[in-house]
Amino acid sequence: MMKNILAIQSHVVYGHAGNSAAEFPMRRLGANVWPLNTVQFSNHTQYGKWTGCVMPPSHLTEIVQGIAAIDKLHTCDAVLSGYLGSAEQGEHILGIVRQVKAANPQAKYFCDPVMGHPEKGCIVAPGVAEFHVRHGLPASDIIAPNLVELEILCEHPVKNVEEAVLAARELIAQGPQIVLVKHLARAGYSRDRFEMLLVTADEAWHISRPLVDFGMRQPVGVGDVTSGLLLVKLLQGATLQEALEHVTAAVYEIMVTTKAMQEYELQVVAAQDRIANPEHYFSATKL
């Protein structure tokens, strides 16, 4: 059965971020994506200027009520949330999650707790980080912080891989069954590799791939693609190891393709066949 995912995150008209980054790769892996946009911007914010608007929180709820009215909400297998335009949007999203789970008790909630990177030009609204700590984390089945977000969620520094696994398990004690640490950065084993962790109460998997050097301007949307693809693989029945290995390879293929084409925006369409069938392989290690 094809899986249906309600993806609630940002949308850009030009380029790739949020749903505009994740939607096509997720579909390419065989999932139906129902994109519900928290913001509609001309382009992502790292250009330094953009136009567009943040959707009123009630807009999100109204759209989902429309899906419920045609009796299709029970076919939703998961809710994915990413970049929020406001903390109030987050509260509406949790209402949507409750509504979806009432219609389909098997449905999962995947929270990508985007909290902003001022140094990268990623700006989030006031109250969003607090929302994730207090409400998003305990409500989620799967949560996917990067290192900075992991430290905010567990409320202490994380200096190495062992501490990252322990921190992930602190989060698991508060609600989610699975934690993806999307980018270990300075807490990883190696400074010249891109490393991730996938952790449950009784398993921890580590994976690394080469960093792709884009100089000063790193492409945006890599985390959005990573979260979306991991959710698809897990819904399709992949093991933790299989899901982590496929996602790591698929994202690497997108990065390599983007660099080869000398582009700043992720080249998800050009890389589509290698998203489904990666040419590279990276082996995950059980810790």
Curated annotation (Swiss-Prot):
Keywords, ordered alphabetically: ATP-binding, Kinase, Magnesium, Nucleotide-binding, Transferase
Residue sites binding substrate per the record: 10, 45-46, 224
A single Gene Ontology CC term: cytosol
Enzyme class, UniProt record, top EC level: transferase
Catalytic reaction list: pyridoxal + ATP = pyridoxal 5'-phosphate + ADP + H(+)
UniProt cross-references to Pfam families, sorted A to Z: Phos_pyr_kin (PF08543)
Keyword Ligase set for record: no
This enzyme's EC code(s): 2.7.1.35
Pathway(s) it belongs to: Cofactor metabolism; pyridoxal 5'-phosphate salvage; pyridoxal 5'-phosphate from pyridoxal: step 1/1
Cofactor or coenzyme needed: Mg(2+)
Gene Ontology terms for molecular function: ATP binding; magnesium ion binding; pyridoxal kinase activity
Residues at which ATP binds: 112, 144, 149, 182, 209-212
Any one GO BP annotation for this protein: pyridoxal 5'-phosphate salvage
Keyword Transit peptide applies: no
InterPro entries registered for this protein in UniProt: PM/HMP-P_kinase-1, PyrdxlKinase, Pyridoxal_kinase_PdxY, Ribokinase-like
Annotated family: Belongs to the pyridoxine kinase family. PdxY subfamily.
Self-association state and partner proteins as the record states: Homodimer.
PANTHER family for this protein: PYRIDOXAL KINASE
Function summary: Pyridoxal kinase involved in the salvage pathway of pyridoxal 5'-phosphate (PLP). Catalyzes the phosphorylation of pyridoxal to PLP.
Name of protein: Pyridoxal kinase PdxY
Lineage, uppermost ranks: Bacteria, Pseudomonadati, Pseudomonadota, Gammaproteobacteria, Enterobacterales
